[in-house]
Amino acid sequence: LLEQGKGPLVLLCPGWPELSYSWRHQIPAIADAGFRVVAPDMRGFGRTSAPADVGAYTLFDNVGDMVALVAALGEKQAVIVGHDWGAPVAWHAAMFRPDVFTRVAGLSVPPPFRGRGLPLETLKNNGITNFYWQYFQTPGVAEAEFERDVAATMRIILGGRGFSDPSAHQFVQDGKGFL
């Protein structure tokens, strides 16, 4: 957890696979603008608890963590900002608990759409079968691939693979894995 400043509370939710450290450049500027800024590590990252049950990582759980954090900080309300996977947490926090989260901003992920199905179903129904979300659904497969060479995994996830098309990293070639 990183914290700086005094004033109304602003929570900064990092994305995947990042930590609160990702906000280190924004925290001083927001604090200097008159806010109390807190950037937590999200559930399962950094020094947080990491439940073994994948069912413990839902948006409801993550929103609950943010609500509990606001209360633990002695506050009743906060502005919530999320980047990447932190953005859906921020958007849903504001939707589910507008009494706590009075303002919301999402970076790189738009507000949740009201589609006809769940996101994974929508991808499949639109003929998309190789998005990284889908690859991560088979228990143990991505984990085994990532654990074979942790340094290479982090280099690729955080630094890219040199694709000329920046969106190419989101797709998995059949039989070749994510990396």
Label each region the model flagged:
Residues 2-49, 69, 83:
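Conserved HGGG/HGGXW glycine-rich cap/lid loop of the alpha/beta-hydrolase fold
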Residues 45-81, 85-179:
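Flexible "cap/lid" subdomain of the alpha/beta-hydrolase fold that forms the substrate-access gate
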